[in-house]
Every structure is written in structure tokens, then in C-alpha cells.
Amino acid sequence: MTVFPGGPPQAEAVLRDAVAMGADDIYLVTDRAFGGADTLATSYTLAAAISKIGMPDLIFCGIESIDSNTAQIGPEIAATLGIADVSGASFISFEKEGGLIVTRQNGSSAEVVELKLPAVVTVLPELNKPRYSSIKGILGKGDAELHIITAADLDIDTARIGIKGSPTQVKRVRPVVPPQKENLRIEEKDPQESVDILIEALRKISVI
């Protein structure tokens, strides 16, 4: 199993944790030239890196990142490499003939998809629980060779990477302030009068 994200040098710590959990090889696709990339430029870069180390039978991607939540990287890698893709996988079984049967979530329903390898599968968190790191893995993770891939290592069009290759750019991020709800305070001492006021207020907002 090979683990390989795109990210800053600080991602090395996560990769070494992956070794402790059983990963065989770790790669880090990192370069200042990749900075500011949107999903299109990122997937192009990762697809080029995958092609460099050799096409695997199966590529797993998380369904989405926790920052932009686009869920586009996996499908775009598949499109760039020209291989099959299934998104939102919640269960996977392997066929003897070298294919996959994938259960994917589609809103409130589920679909069962059969596909041939090589393929990209983007997975939901509930697909599997990560294994615990072994003592041997923890002790040996610092000795694992980390392979660094930079822009100079790839056969790519530099106009398609980083911020230059990104047709979409984030100009501003601002919090969404939810509308304030109007509060109702009933100060009448008579219980029946208080109930009448409450009922009338609920009718005005179509609750009853």
C-alpha cells in the first residue's frame, strides 16, 4: 500500500503515522509551484505523480477535504488518467476476476456498481475504521524512506499547476451569520392570559 498526499513538508508527520498503521511506501507531492491550486490543478498534479511512480490497480481518495468540501479531486484524477471512478463508497467487495463491486450512497438511497480495475474510488468515513498502529510500526516509522516529488520530477505543463493553472480562486472567506430569531418574553402573572399570548404568537408564525 502506497500513501501519497499533496501538501506542505509538514505532511511528513501524517505519512509516518500511516507507516505505523501498515503503509508500505510513502510519497509527498510538494513544491511551492503547486501552491494556490484549485481542484483542477491539484488533480492534474496528483495524476502526473501517480503516472510517474506507476499506475496502481486501485486508488482510494477521501470523499472530500475538511476545508473546501468540493468532493472533486477523486473524480478529476480518474478523468485525467482515463480510468473508472465511483464516488461516495460505503462498502467494497473484490471479485476474483479482478473487478470491484461498490455500494455507493446517492442521497437517501444506495447504488451497487460493478467496475473493472484500474479505478478510483472515493470513500465515505463509514467505509472502514482505521487500524491501530502496531508497536513495531511506531518504532519503525521514523526509518521509513520518504519519497519527495516536486514539479521538476514530473512531466507536466507548468501552466496547469498551482495558482496559474487554477481557473477558480478564493477571493474572500467570510462567516455566515444566521438570522437572529425574535424572542418572546411573557410577563403576565395570570396563567390563562399567558397561555393566550403564547398561542397567538405561535399562530402568527404558523406554528399552530
Predicted regions located by residue number:
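N-terminal glycine-rich FAD/FM-binding segment characteristic of electron-transfer flavoproteins
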Residues: M1-I208
